[in-house]
Regions:
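Structured alpha/beta or helical-core interaction and ligand-binding surfaces enriched in interleaved
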Residues: 1-183
Length: 183
């Protein structure tokens, strides 16, 4: 069993915090490395999410999704677990714009062989998870913790890994990872 340091309970799900640490993905995974990253993620993750921030307003049918994002959402519909409105998701917390709180639609899906194939077909590189595609692909472990966090608009992504997971993952994917130090 993982070394559990604390238990955090949120209103939407239980999240177990472990000894996992964030590791920044040094170079954007593209092509085979992108597909390898997703396949490695599917080994330890059972869900994924991405986001729609309907700007500038948040009315029922407003969306930032263009045709490619809408097609992907339609294709993934059988895998949809939930669609919620929230101000935060892994790696991001929305602020206020002109005194108005911003909200995003968070799409959560089951990650299985079929949905994995759809993610692989949607694009061939990690930081393309922004318009015209949905924002910020994240892969979630069964305990609710993000395995992969993407902040595509900032060309940033990191993985939460236990120390013993780092070297084997780098060997299998060919990716460079760097321990993410917070200031």
């Amino acid at each position: 069993m993982a070394n559990i340091s604390r238990l955090t309970i949120t209103t939407s799900e239980f999240v177990i915090r472990s000894s996992r640490e964030p590791y920044r993905i040094v170079n954007e995974p593209r092509g085979p490395r992108y597909r390898g990253l997703l396949r490695e993620g599917a080994r330890v993750s059972d869900r994924f999410l991405f986001v729609d921030i309907p700007e500038p307003f948040y009315r029922e049918h407003d969306t930032s999704f263009g045709p490619a994002a809408k097609r992907l959402v339609e294709e993934l519909a059988p895998h949809l677990i939930s669609l919620t409105s929230d101000r935060s998701w892994p790696g991001t917390r929305l602020g206020e714009v002109h005194g108005v709180k911003s909200y995003a639609r968070i799409y959560r899906y089951r990650l299985d062989a079929e949905s994995l194939e759809m993610l692989e077909r949607a694009t061939d590189h990690l930081f393309s998870w922004q318009p015209p595609l949905p924002l910020d692909l994240c892969l979630l472990r069964p305990d609710g913790e993000a395995w992969l966090t993407t902040i595509a608009s900032e060309d940033t992504a990191y993985l939460r890994l236990a120390p013993e997971e780092v070297a084997p993952l780098m060997d299998r994917t060919g990716m460079d990872l760097q321990r993410y130090l917070r200031h």
